Regions:
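Intrinsically disordered, low-complexity, mixed-charge
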Residues: 1-103
Length: 103
């Protein structure tokens, strides 16, 4: 298991990108979070097997209405998540539960 931190820029906000990322993560059994950042970027934590994470990143490029101009990823210390959540604002997921990343 590995965790990657991903920063994505381009036309990635207000186009359904976070929902698309969550759908792909759920299909691939990847856990983590996705959230919008100030300045129009998106931040993702993704945890899974290396081959699956590579597929996850490649599938993200196929989200409709999205134009990815830059995607930077780096491996970070393992973070464990129960599922994959869209973070609406700092510390609160779509379901309204506070997320806690365990490292």
């Amino acid at each position: 298991m590995k965790t990657v931190e991903i920063f994505i820029s381009g036309r990635v906000q207000k186009v359904g990108f976070r929902a698309c990322v969550k759908r792909i993560a759920t299909e691939l059994n990847v856990t983590g979070t996705v959230r919008n950042l100030p300045g129009g970027r998106v931040h993702v934590y993704a945890t899974g097997e290396l081959m699956i994470l590579e597929k996850f990143v490649s599938m993200v490029y196929g989200c409709p209405r999205v134009l990815i101009r830059d995607l930077r990823q780096s491996e970070i210390p393992l973070k464990k998540f129960d599922d994959f959540s869209i973070i609406k604002r700092e510390g609160v997921s779509v379901q309204g539960f506070k997320f806690t990343a365990v490292s």
